[in-house]
Structures are given as C-alpha cells and as structure tokens.
C-alpha cells in the first residue's frame, strides 16, 4: 500500500502528482493484518481526505497505517520518531502536524514514522483507547523492522501535537502491557518510546480544574524523558505540560525540558510565526542532540 491517505479523486490531479513526486521514497503499510481491535462493521464511514482552511484533514480512519519517511542515507543517524498528528481525536491534521514534521526530522538525519491512527472517537470507548492500540502496535512494528528501516530500536521516540500529544503521553505511560491481544511477533517487542516530544498536548488536565493530571495519566520513574512546548494563550491549558514536567522531575526522571511561551495559540505545528514559539523545532533538535539521540 503506497501513500494510502491521498487519492486522485479527492485532490486535483496536479497536486496528486506533486505529492507522489515529493514523497516517492515513502513506504506505507497497514498496522493490522485484519480489522483493528474492537472495530465494528459500519461504525465509521469511508475514509476521507480534504483541505479546509489550509489544513489537510483526514477523517473516518478505520484501517490505521504507518508511513515511513526514511532519512537520506548520507545524513541518517539511525534514530526514529513516531509522529502523531492532532485533531481532537476526530480528524488528523495530516500535513502540518504530520508529513511536514517527518520532513523536518529527515533534515536532522532522523527517520520519521507517520501514524494514521483511528478517528473519530469510537462509541462506548475512551477517546484514546483505539488510537493507543494503534500507537503501541506501531512501536512494535518499527522495532520488528528496525534492520530493514535502518533505525536503532533503542533510539525510537514519539512526537505528538494536541490530541496526538495526548496519545503520545498515553503511549509513554502505558508501555508495560499491550492494550490488545497479541497479533504477531511485533507485539512481543517493547512499545516503550525512548523519549517524548509533546507540542501543546491536550487532555492532560481539566479545563476548569487545572491542578492535577487526569487519573489515566500514570507517570512513574520509568516514564521516558520529555520535551514540552506550549503557550500561555493556548485554549488547551499549559498547566498540563507544566504538571507533567513537575511530576517527571519529582519522580527522578532526568533530562526533561519545558518551554511555555507567552503567545502563539494552538495548532501552529511548524508554521512560520513572529512569536518565539516558532523556535520550538530548533529547541527540540538541540534537546535531542544534548540527550545523545542524534549521534551516528
């Protein structure tokens, strides 16, 4: 399955051809050999991709997939990062919080793995339940294919925006056991990320009562170190990032870095801005280098 999200019937032919040219080296594969765990027939309409307000939105995902963006051989350092776009667990902001991020990672010599997880939220299931299954499965698949994809399984991080940041947090804190029955050998490998990069992560605290993380977020001394970027004027409370940072430090997890910028709002991804928050990619890159993950 090549470039599964983009279809000529949904985009102008020229745009489709440009996409194929830009991402010709990517490889995509479904996460599950059959239907994904807990999926019900007819629960989700046919998958859609559309651009609204300059944002490429992917919706109605019932067959989650992983797209590999390999770093150029001469620049590759063996590190990999699983990228989780945001979208409120209802859609996926697939370009500016997805493929564009993988391109940035490639510029650092890092192989990006773009996760197309299940949306929208499933009835009678926690908002993150199906996406967490997809993320855990993806981590195992990357490690299983580490030799083929030329990545070090001990240098495999996770990066998420907004709801994708919440998904990254759940993956960072729920790695002791799989949230689904074992499928194959990939599920015998660890789904613990080496680190997390959390950009305006959502659903960490209640919007009104902001003094505690939600109880499903279980930080421990084994939680990987994290980089946080948030803004004070974000509708998603920055207290979530602050509280998680403090909890990590309290439990002796070292190497965390927190940035709370005054302005910038929400959903900016890596788009240019006059606000200092636009420097977060440089800060994150410097953090990864300082932590030793970018070494060849």
Report the location of each language-model feature.
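Catalytic nucleophile-loop/oxyanion-hole region of alpha/beta-hydrolase
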Residues: 93-94, 100-101, 117-150, 274-277
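Short amphipathic alpha-helix adjacent to the substrate-entry channel of hydrolases
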Residues: 95-113
């Amino acid at each position: 399955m090549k470039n599964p999200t983009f279809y000529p019937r949904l985009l102008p032919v020229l745009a489709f051809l440009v996409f194929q040219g830009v991402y010709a080296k990517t490889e995509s594969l479904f996460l599950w050999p059959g239907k994904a765990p807990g999926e019900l027939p007819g629960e989700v309409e046919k998958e859609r991709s559309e651009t609204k307000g300059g944002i490429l939105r992917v919706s109605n995902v019932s067959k989650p997939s992983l797209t590999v963006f390999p770093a150029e051989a001469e620049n590759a350092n063996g590190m990999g990062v699983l990228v989780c776009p945001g979208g409120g667990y209802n859609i996926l902001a697939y370009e500016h919080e997805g493929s564009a991020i993988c391109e940035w990672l490639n510029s650092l010599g890092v192989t990006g793995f773009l996760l197309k997880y299940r949306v929208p939220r499933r009835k009678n299931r926690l908002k993150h339940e199906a996406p967490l299954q997809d993320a855990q499965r993806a981590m195992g698949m990357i490690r299983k294919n580490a030799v083929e994809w030329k990545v070090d399984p001990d240098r495999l991080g996770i990066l998420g925006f907004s709801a994708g940041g919440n998904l990254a947090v759940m993956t960072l804190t729920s790695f002791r056991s799989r949230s689904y029955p074992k499928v194959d050998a990939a599920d015998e490998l660890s789904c613990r990320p080496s680190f997390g990069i959390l950009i305006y992560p959502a659903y960490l605290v209640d919007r009104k009562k902001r003094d505690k993380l939600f109880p499903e977020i279980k930080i421990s001394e084994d939680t990987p170190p994290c980089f946080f970027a948030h803004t004070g004027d974000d509708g998603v409370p920055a207290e979530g990032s602050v509280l998680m940072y403090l909890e990590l430090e309290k439990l002796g997890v070292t190497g965390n870095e927190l940035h709370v910028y005054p302005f910038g709002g929400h959903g900016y991804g890596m788009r240019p801005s006059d606000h200092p928050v636009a420097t977060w990619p440089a800060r994150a890159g410097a953090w990864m280098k300082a932590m030793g993950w970018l070494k060849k």
